[in-house]
């Protein structure tokens, strides 16, 4: 997160909504830089960023409860345009003298908005007398407006669904314009940013690249940087950006834990050495990792072993180089946004995340994180800007622990080889069918289950392979991909015929939630 003022930016105050990041994505899509700050530190964030407009997010809290969160008064004293969404609308009204009460008719899901009056946010989009679909999710509702506000649109259960004080440039909506279920929502946010706040929208990956390179050079000076290269998009883009800034002062280390997809480590090493002239060390630590993982079935234990061994191996290799002053990481913006809690309790850990963990503290290095202001889609755009091929940028996400968490139960080299071959065939069939780019993530899972089969004249007793494919926008929610049955038949037949050790293939039709994308 940037530590200084950012010209032509938007500040998003987060009250704990599950979709606050979508607001930021819509602002970025409009070509404008923005930052999310939790309400507890919003005043500090406002002073630091010096934005040109403010958006107040939704929240699971109720504005009528004692101690419920509020926007800092400095926002309303600043004279800047403010857009309140759902809870953001309610707290804005309460803080400016209006009234809110718990609704007797809660409104969740699709609703229709009737436009009563024209307003600046509707320019080129909506007109008086028109009706539009929106997405509601609220219990409380505004019952009396502050001075200066007027109602510009209503719904059947929300008489103050869209309000405006055009003199002060304050706008509030009871629905969620940031979600895709509000078809014109992104355009409404764009109108607020461009038409009301007067922000041009010239923030681009080219401009970000130039700024990031300058900041890396200033931070690193003539010191050395090491970077853990996994072969994923995030670490690869971070490495290329750091290399552009400091050249041979960067050394990348690829720790091959033996849990990658077929030929993946070799292909990554070849690409970076041949096309980008990076100083890259390829460390084959597969015996070390698989030796400790063999027989381990608990997924959390697997992740912790992999994380510990990664740190130990990386640390050993870095010391052989004589150490470094900086550690480069592909940390993204969603990783650094502070979570908002109303209870003070910790969030539930669904899965431990595998990354470089405690390396900076252990090795007394400072972090270089050139992607920490970007979302995943922006990292891909930056990768294209840096010259990475689309075939690499568009690869499906791959977990840090690799095939270890796609092999439930105990791990052996034999199982990993069986899984690696099945996965390669599955992905090959997806590419042949022209489906790869339509799917967010696809992979094979080797189940710790054996079943009876018949091949030729003999009886078999071999493993079951599960195929998984999902569609998603950001990985937060996902639906299983609806394949044609002929495709599944082709993929299953090839896997059974070509992979020794598998005699049955099944397809996973679980969405997220209730399931997760990965099996472990």
Curated annotation (Swiss-Prot):
Binding site for ATP: 230-236
Record's signal peptide: none
Stored Pfam families: GATase, GMP_synt_C, NAD_synthase
Gene Ontology cellular component list: cytosol
All copies of domain GMPS ATP-PPase, residue ranges: 203-395
Active-site positions on this chain: 86, 176, 178
Reactions accelerated catalytically: XMP + L-glutamine + ATP + H2O = GMP + L-glutamate + AMP + diphosphate + 2 H(+)
Keyword Nucleotide-binding: yes
Annotated PROSITE patterns: GATASE_TYPE_1, GMPS_ATP_PPASE
EC number annotated for this UniProt entry: 6.3.5.2
GO molecular function, one term: ATP binding
Keyword Ligase applies: yes
Glutamine amidotransferase type-1 domain: residues covered: 9-202
Cited InterPro entries: Class_I_gatase-like, GATASE, GMP_synth_C, GMP_synth_GATase, GMP_synthase, GMPS_ATP_PPase_dom, NAD/GMP_synthase, Rossmann-like_a/b/a_fold
Task of the protein: Catalyzes the synthesis of GMP from XMP.
Subunit structure: Homodimer.
Protein's recorded name: GMP synthase [glutamine-hydrolyzing]
Taxonomic classification: Bacteria, Pseudomonadati, Pseudomonadota, Alphaproteobacteria, Hyphomicrobiales
């Amino acid at each position: 997160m940037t530590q200084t003022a950012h010209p032509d930016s938007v500040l998003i105050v987060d009250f704990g909504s599950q979709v606050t990041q979508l607001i930021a994505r819509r602002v970025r899509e409009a070509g404008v830089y923005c930052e999310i700050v939790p309400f507890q530190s919003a005043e500090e964030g406002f002073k630091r960023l010096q934005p040109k407009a403010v958006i107040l997010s939704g929240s699971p809290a109720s504005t009528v409860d004692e101690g419920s969160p509020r926007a800092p008064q400095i926002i309303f004293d600043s004279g800047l345009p403010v857009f309140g969404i759902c809870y953001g609308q309610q707290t804005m009204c309460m803080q400016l003298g209006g009234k809110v009460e718990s609704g007797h008719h809660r409104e969740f899901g699709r609703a229709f908005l009737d436009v009563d009056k024209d307003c600046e946010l509707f320019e080129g989009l909506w007109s008086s007398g028109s009706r539009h679909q929106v997405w509601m999710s609220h219990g409380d509702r505004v019952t009396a407006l502050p001075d200066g506000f007027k109602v510009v649109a209503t719904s059947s259960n929300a008489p103050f669904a869209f309000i405006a004080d055009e003199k002060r440039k304050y706008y509030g909506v009871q629905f969620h314009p940031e979600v895709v279920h509000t078809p014109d929502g992104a355009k409404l946010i764009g109108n607020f940013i461009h038409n009301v706040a007067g922000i041009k929208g010239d923030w681009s990956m080219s401009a970000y690249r130039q700024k990031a390179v300058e900041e890396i050079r200033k931070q690193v000076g003539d010191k050395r940087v090491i970077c853990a290269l996994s072969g994923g998009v995030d670490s690869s883009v971070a490495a290329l950006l750091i290399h552009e800034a400091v050249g041979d002062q960067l050394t990348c280390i690829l720790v091959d834990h033996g849990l990658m997809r077929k030929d993946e480590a070799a292909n990554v090493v070849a690409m970076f050495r041949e096309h980008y002239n990076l100083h890259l060390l390829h460390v084959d630590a597969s015996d070390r990792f698989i030796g400790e993982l063999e027989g381990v079935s608990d997924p959390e234990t697997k992740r912790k072993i992999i994380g510990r061994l990664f740190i130990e191996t990386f640390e050993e290799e870095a010391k052989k180089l004589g150490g470094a002053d900086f550690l480069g990481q592909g940390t993204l913006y969603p990783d650094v946004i502070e979570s908002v809690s109303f209870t003070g309790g910790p969030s539930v850990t669904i899965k431990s995340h595998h990354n470089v963990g405690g390396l900076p503290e252990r090795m007394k290095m400072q972090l270089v994180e050139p992607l920490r202001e970007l979302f995943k889609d922006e990292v891909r755009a930056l990768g294209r800007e840096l010259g990475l091929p689309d075939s690499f940028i568009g690869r499906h996400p791959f977990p840090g622990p690799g095939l270890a968490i796609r092999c439930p139960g105990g791990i052996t080299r034999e199982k990993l080889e069986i899984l690696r071959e099945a996965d390669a065939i599955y992905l090959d069939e997806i590419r042949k069918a022209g489906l790869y780019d339509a799917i967010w993530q696809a992979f094979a899972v080797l189940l710790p289950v054996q079943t009876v089969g018949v091949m030729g004249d003999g009886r078999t007793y071999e493993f079951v392979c599960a195929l998984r494919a999902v569609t998603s926008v950001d990985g937060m929610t996902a639906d299983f991909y609806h394949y044609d049955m002929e495709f599944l038949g082709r993929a299953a037949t090839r896997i059974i015929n070509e992979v020794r050790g598998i005699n049955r293939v099944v397809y996973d039709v679980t969405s997220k939630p209730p399931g997760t994308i990965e099996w472990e």
